[in-house]
């Protein structure tokens, strides 16, 4: 799944090698979580998966908040900003979970790597951010990659469209994170994202909830623990290295997706997926490069 932390946080940059190692490990852990979600997905509504995943993640983060200073650190001046970000996260997660249950992991991961492209485009539209011709060229190249990965010569199914929608939702959470980060603490942002997301997803439960067997609950818990561990490793990576250094290693998620598809489901990536991945990765890496240059003193 696309990640919205590594695209905005800035670390101290004193140990890039360790940061890269932690980021690659984090992506591997989160990719493993996606395998559990793919296994669970066909039997449950994606909103139920989203609800349980967010609930478990909230329970995991609460002890850390209590240790860091208690409920006092959760004071916020921007509740609607947190609510909007949580809504984007819920819709994005539900879209990805729907797609994971119906598409090869690699297909979903390739399209999801367009998050930086969507985020840049949304920044232009809603934040009036200035984007030069170089980044516009990268955006066009990346969106061409998305079109190729969708394989328009065949039938574009609902799961593929759900992946694009989910990617757009995740991009919106990035912009909201950038805005909230100017006034809110990291603990506040993470807690309200998870807790409000749980509440939003819970609103759908009267219509989509089905009984969950004990064995499946174990898979949900495993997915929640892996998700929390992946986020911790990613946060650690961003503490010891600059975001511009570690963010490009998000693209290793494509490799993980291909490997899991081959080993578990014996699925080889299609040529449109491979070619689309090249376009999207090249465009995203170039945008990271340009943003690093623009931020340089």
Describe these PLM feature segments.
Residues 35-38, 46-47, 61, 153-211, ...:
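Transmembrane alpha-helical segments that form core, pore/gating elements
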Residues 134-150, 170, 272-291:
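Hydrophobic transmembrane alpha-helices of multi-pass small-molecule transport proteins
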Residues 68-107, 112, 148, 225-240:
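Specific transmembrane alpha-helical segments of multi-pass solute transporters/efflux pumps
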Residues 1-28, 58-84, 195, 199-222, ...:
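Membrane-interface interhelical linkers
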Residues 2-6, 255-297:
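C-terminal-most transmembrane helix of multi-pass membrane proteins
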Residues 27-32, 62, 86-94, 116-121, ...:
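Hydrophobic/small/kink-forming positions within alpha-helical transmembrane segments
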Residues 98, 115-137, 255-274:
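C-terminal transmembrane-helix exit sites in multi-pass transporters
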Residues 108-114, 180, 184-193, 231-262:
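Helix-helix packing/entry segments at the starts of transmembrane helices
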């Amino acid at each position: 799944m696309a990640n919205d932390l590594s695209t905005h946080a800035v670390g101290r940059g004193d140990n890039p090698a360790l940061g890269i190692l932690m980021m690659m490990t984090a992506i591997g852990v989160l990719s493993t979580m996606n395998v559990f979600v793919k296994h669970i997905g066909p039997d449950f509504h994606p909103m139920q998966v989203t609800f349980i995943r967010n609930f478990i993640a909230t329970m995991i983060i609460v002890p850390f908040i209590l240790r860091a200073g208690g409920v006092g650190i959760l004071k916020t001046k921007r509740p609607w900003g947190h609510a909007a970000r949580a809504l984007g996260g819920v819709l994005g997660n539900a879209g990805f979970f729907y797609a994971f249950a119906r598409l090869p992991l690699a297909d979903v991961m390739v399209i999801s790597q367009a998050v930086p492209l969507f985020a840049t485009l949304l920044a232009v539209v809603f934040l009036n951010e200035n984007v030069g011709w170089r980044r516009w060229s990268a955006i066009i190249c990346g969106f061409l990659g998305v079109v190729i990965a969708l394989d328009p010569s065949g039938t574009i199914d609902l799961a593929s469209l759900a992946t694009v929608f989910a990617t757009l939702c995740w991009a919106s959470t990035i912009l909201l994170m950038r805005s909230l980060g100017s006034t809110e603490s990291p603990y506040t942002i993470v807690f309200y994202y998870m807790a409000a997301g749980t509440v939003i997803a819970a609103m759908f439960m009267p219509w989509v909830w089905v009984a969950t067997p004990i064995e499946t609950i174990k898979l949900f818990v495993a997915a929640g623990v892996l998700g929390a561990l992946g986020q911790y490793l990613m946060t650690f990576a961003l503490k010891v290295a600059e975001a511009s250094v570690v963010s490009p290693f998000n693209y290793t998620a494509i490799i993980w997706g291909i490997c899991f598809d081959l080993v578990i489901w014996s699925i080889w990536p299609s040529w449109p997926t491979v070619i689309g991945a090249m376009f999207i990765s090249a465009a995203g890496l170039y945008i990271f490069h340009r943003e690093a240059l623009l931020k340089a003193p």
